[in-house]
Structure formats: structure tokens, C-alpha cells
């Protein structure tokens, strides 16, 4: 246990233990490490990690934090990529407590499963499983849902994802606690469900799902998308979506941990069981952009998703994301979640042993899975060899014929080069998993080449919707400082992930600032969907949102490179 700043902090640990038991109050460096270390960025010391088992215990723990002047970081799955789920290297003036919500994972379906009430630790994977039995699906259905990310975490960070009809994760219906400037805790119930007036009674009823149908407000109109589908079609000089967009900032939505969220109410969508997947290859980025504009201008419904990756990113995924690809393809999401947890635990153990490092489990996994055949379908590897740029396009089954016709006519034109094919079931699954594997490939590459690299320099970028020159071309003096780069993203939204590994001896902070400025000069917004965390300075309008939610600055202090001091001092 780290040394508390004062006796009051030590007393707080005793109070937490009385609330949830010693087993769920973690204080040793080894026990807290999986919670205090970010996936790519962020690490720091905490007084304790709390693992409450109920919403009422969350509420009671918050009261202890207020009474003992502690900073609270409410953490869900800790899958964030910018360090905002844990402490950072900042000048904190109070001890920090992480409150992990993962034990509180209940989900209540309401209004004939057209909406869901997800408690603080409910995962997207669990929600997806629960909704499938009702022929429904949640906002996010790929990517973060496979590594244990939570519904509340997605709302708090306005996560985007691949579903171009749906837009960022957003709700105006949530139940949360905020602390006012006088240090008083307020429970705010905007779920649209009458649960009474006493906070502990409300939270207990909420967790048990104890309400009458008549106490629940009706759902919104049912559809396969949102207004975002019309928004993304507009080819104007602004990004389609980005983290600081005030359109998507409302209480829990975009809160980045500046309040304590107990549950959110989100709409669900009809599950499209009949889908068609097309794999598209070209050597010219301009052809993909022209194709994007053809689909956005078409009269029919938007595709479900349109995911880009370079051929080089494909190669990185099959070499350095192979454990992700093989595990998901042959064992499923549940096994991958367990594997991530086991790897995190093992890295924590190895880090404490002489002669080992904090990435030993990654090295072992990399070696073991290199011996396993990936069995990638031949048409995918053929396109990998033939074309530099790839697009994975998923459409509704009813749009299969129209999509194939559009693609045939597009590539028949003398001004365009490339080819396509409709995937069979194995090809569709494999292509999707390779695209997902790219997201972890650059991180694994860095881990395996740490001796020759200084740091990862990563971006998630929201480009202008009308940006024709969308693929980054770095000046030579910047490109020479990079050892590796991977480009991939949600192409129709013009949201790209650009993961770089800087060479040994390069100043990654200075390099990131220079590269960020190049993007801003192009009219892009950074970040697009991973939020500001500990690596991006939040703009003024977003800081104003944070300060309104948290006037004492006791929740996730310092996020977005803001002040870590009490009262924003």
C-alpha cells in the first residue's frame, strides 16, 4: 500500500473495507497494477482500488471519498487507449481512489427490448448476447465489444465504432451522482423511470429491476439508425464526429468520468441477420474516396459499415495481432476477454520478478501463436498481395444486388482501378477479425521491439467530410523518425486510426505535437473517438462541460490535461 498523504486517507481505507470487505479493497502495488496501468498510456499510484458489488456500495464509497477529500476515478473495463481510465503523471494534491464497476454488471431490457438499462459495469458483449435472443443489437457490435468494454464507458467517451448509421454512443437518459461546489452529493435520476426519492432506495430498486412498466417512459421510434446517417452524407468542410462535438455532450454522454454514472438507458436496434460483405482492393486512395462518395450520394440506405486498412496493416495484424485473430475465430469473444485478463495479470507478476519485464506475457503469446497456422482464406491474401488499400464493406442483405451492381459499374470505368468480390461466411469473418486485429498489432509490435523504439505515437483522427486527399503523407523529416506505421479506420465517417512507433532516441512528445499540428492544419479534429485521456489537451468548450459537471474537480482530476488540483486551482 502506498503511504497515505494523511491520517484521513488511512481512515478512508478502513471505511471502504467496512463497506465492501477486505477482499474488494486492493492496496498493494501488484494488486492495483491492472487498474492503474492503461492499455497504451497512463500509469500512476493510487491509495486503493475499490471493487463494490452493488450500486448502493458505490454510493456509500463515494460518500467516504467526499468526507476524506479523495479524488475518485470511476473505472469500467480500463480498455481506453489514451490513459483516461486511470491516474497519470500529474501534480495531484489529494490521494486517488479507483472505483472499479465491473462486479455491477446487470442489464434490464425494457419496452419490449427496444431499450436497455445497463448498470455501471455491464459490458457491450453481455448486452449484445442478451439482445440477440430478442432479435436486437446494441449501438456497438464489433471491436471494443470483444475486449470487455462497457456500455457506460462508451457513453462517457462518446465512442464511435464501425456502425456508420448510428453515430457516436450517446444518451440523455442516465442516473448519476455529482458533487456540488459545497461538497454535497446529489443523485440525479434522468432515466425516465420513477424509482422514488431516497438515494439508497432508488439504487437498490434499480439494481433489482424493481419497477412497474407504467413507471417507464415510452421508447423512441424504432429504426436501424439515427439522424447521424443523414449527417454523415453531407460532404462539408467539418468532421462527421469527434470527441469535443457539443452535439454529443450531455450529462453522462461525454462526461469522461467527471460524474459517477450508475446506469444508462440506451436504445437498441433491429438485428440484421441477412448481411452481405464485399471486399474491395485498389492501389489508389483516390478511388476509395470516389467510391465512398458514390455510396453516400446513393438513394438507398447507407451500408452498415465500411472499414479501411492498408495492405501493410493487414500484414501487421496477421503477424502481431495473430493471437487476437486466432482466439476470436476459433474460441470466440468470451475466451478473448479471459485471455486479455490473464495476460494482464501475468504481466503484472512478471514485472515484479528479476530478469523479466512488464511485457513478458505478450512475448510468450507472440511466440506461441507464431506456431499456429492462421488459415486466412486465399482470396484475402491474394488481394493483400495485389492491392495497397482495402475496404471491407458490409450492407443489408436487401442491398446485395444493388451494391454489386454499383461496384461493377464503378470499376468498369476507365478512371478507376481495382476489384472486388462478395465474401462467403468464412471470408467475411476472417476479414472482420483481421481488421479488428490491426488495432492491437501496433501495440504488440512496439512491445516486441521496445529496445529499438522510444514510444508509440497514436492518433484517432476525424477528417473533414469533404477531404479528398484523406490518406496522410508525412514530410520526410517526420517519416524518418518512425520505425513503423499502421493506417486503418471507419472510412465512410472519415475517422482514421494512425498508429506509429517512434525510433529510439526520438522525442515522442515533440513528434506528436508536430504531427497533431499537421492534422489540425488540414481541418481535422483530434481525437475522434478515443477521448482526450492523459495525452490530449481538452479544448475550452469541453473543459467548460467538465467544470459544470464537477465544480470541485474530485472526479478524474487532470483528464484532458486539465488542472489536477481541488476546485480547479
Where on the chain are the PLM-derived regions?
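General beta-strand structural signal in soluble alpha/beta enzymes
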Residues: 24-29, 51-52, 72-76, 83, ...
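FAD-binding subdomain of flavoenzyme oxidoreductases
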Residues: 108, 125, 132-287
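Conserved glycine-rich FAD pyrophosphate-binding loop
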Residues: 2-6, 20, 38-48, 70, ...
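Residue-level signal for inorganic ion chemistry
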Residues: 16, 65, 498
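Conserved oxyanion/phosphate-binding beta-strand-loop segments in alpha/beta enzyme cores
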Residues: 15-36
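C-terminal cap/substrate-recognition region of VAO/PCMH-type FAD-linked oxidoreductases
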Residues: 250, 260, 265, 276-283, ...
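Anion-binding (especially nucleotide phosphate/pyrophosphate-binding) glycine-rich loop
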Residues: 89-104, 110-150
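Glycine-rich N-terminal segment of FAD-binding domains in flavoprotein oxidoreductases
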Residues: 29-104, 118, 138-139
Amino acid at each position: 500500500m502506498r503511504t497515505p498523504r494523511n491520517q484521513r486517507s488511512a481512515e478512508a481505507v478502513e471505511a471502504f473495507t467496512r463497506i465492501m470487505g477486505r477482499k474488494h479493497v486492493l492496496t498493494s502495488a501488484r494488486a492495483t497494477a491492472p487498474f492503474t496501468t492503461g492499455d497504451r498510456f497512463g500509469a500512476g499510484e493510487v491509495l486503493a482500488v475499490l471493487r463494490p458489488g452493488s450500486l448502493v456500495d458505490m454510493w456509500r464509497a463515494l460518500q467516504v471519498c467526499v468526507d476524506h477529500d479523495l479524488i475518485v476515478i470511476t473505472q469500467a473495463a480500463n480498455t481506453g487507449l489514451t490513459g483516461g481510465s486511470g491516474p497519470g503523471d500529474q501534480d495531484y494534491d489529494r490521494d486517488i481512489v479507483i472505483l472499479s464497476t465491473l462486479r455491477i454488471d446487470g442489464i434490464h431490457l425494457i419496452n419490449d427490448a427496444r431499450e436497455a438499462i445497463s448498470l455501471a459495469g455491464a459490458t457491450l458483449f453481455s448486452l449484445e448476447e442478451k439482445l440477440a435472443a430478442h432479435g436486437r443489437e446494441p449501438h456497438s457490435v464489433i471491436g471494443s465489444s470483444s475486449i470487455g468494454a462497457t456500455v457506460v464507458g462508451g457513453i462517457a467517451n462518446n465512442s464511435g465504432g464501425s456502425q456508420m448509421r448510428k453515430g457516436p454512443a450517446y444518451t440523455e437518459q442516465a442516473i448519476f451522482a455529482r458533487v456540488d461546489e459545497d461538497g454535497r452529493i446529489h443523485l440525479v435520476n434522468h432515466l425516465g423511470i420513477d424509482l422514488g426519492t431516497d438515494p439508497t432506495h432508488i439504487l437498490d430498486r434499480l439494481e433489482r429491476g424493481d419497477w412497474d412498466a407504467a413507471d417507464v417512459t415510452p421508447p423512441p421510434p424504432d429504426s436501424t439508425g439515427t439522424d447521424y446517417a443523414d449527417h454523415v452524407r453531407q460532404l462539408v468542410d467539418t468532421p462527421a464526429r469527434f470527441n469535443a462535438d457539443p452535439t454529443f455532450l450531455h450529462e453522462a454522454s461525454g462526461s469522461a468520468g467527471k460524474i459517477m454514472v450508475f446506469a444508462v438507458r440506451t436504445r437498441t436496434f433491429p438485428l440484421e441477420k441477412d448481411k452481405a460483405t464485399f471486399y474491395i482492393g485498389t492501389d489508389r486512395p483516390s478511388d476509395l474516396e470516389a467510391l465512398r462518395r458514390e455510396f453516400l450520394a446513393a438513394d438507398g440506405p447507407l451500408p452498415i459499415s465500411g472499414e479501411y486498412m492498408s495492405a501493410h496493416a493487414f500484414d501487421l495484424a496477421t503477424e502481431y495481432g495473430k493471437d487476437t485473430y486466432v482466439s476470436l475465430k476459433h474460441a470466440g469473444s468470451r475466451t478473448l476477454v479471459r485471455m486479455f485478463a490473464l495476460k494482464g495479470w501475468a504481466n503484472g507478476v512478471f514485472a515484479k520478478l528479476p530478469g523479466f519485464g512488464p511485457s513478458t506475457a505478450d512475448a510468450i503469446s507472440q511466440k506461441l501463436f507464431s506456431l499456429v497456422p492462421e488459415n486466412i482464406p486465399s482470396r484475402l491474401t491474394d488481394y493483400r498481395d495485389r492491392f495497397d488499400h482495402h475496404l471491407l464493406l458490409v450492407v443489408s442483405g436487401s442491398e446485395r444486388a444493388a451494391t454489386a451492381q454499383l461496384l461493377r459499374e464503378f470499376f468498369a470505368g476507365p478512371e478507376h482501378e481495382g476489384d472486388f468480390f462478395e465474401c462467403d461466411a468464412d471470408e467475411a469473418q476472417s476479414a472482420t477479425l483481421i481488421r479488428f486485429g490491426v488495432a492491437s498489432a501496433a501495440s504488440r509490435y512496439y512491445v516486441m521491439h521496445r529496445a529499438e523504439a522510444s514510444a508509440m505515437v497514436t492518433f484517432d483522427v476525424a477528417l473533414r467530410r469533404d477531404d479528398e486527399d484523406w490518406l496522410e503523407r508525412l514530410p520526410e523529416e517526420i517519416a524518418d523518425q518512425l520505425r513503423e506505421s499502421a493506417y486503418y479506420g471507419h472510412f465512410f465517417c472519415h475517422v482514421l486510426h494512425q498508429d506509429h512507433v517512434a525510433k529510439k532516441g526520438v522525442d515522442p512528445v515533440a513528434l506528436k505535437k508536430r504531427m497533431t499540428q499537421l492534422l489540425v492544419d488540414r481541418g481535422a479534429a483530434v481525437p475522434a473517438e478515443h477521448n482526450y485521456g492523459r495525452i490530449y489537451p481538452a479544448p475550452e468548450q469541453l473543459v467548460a462541460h467538465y467544470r459544470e459537471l464537477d465544480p470541485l474537480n474530485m472526479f478524474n482530476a487532470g483528464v484532458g490535461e486539465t488542472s489536477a488540483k481541488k476546485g480547479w486551482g
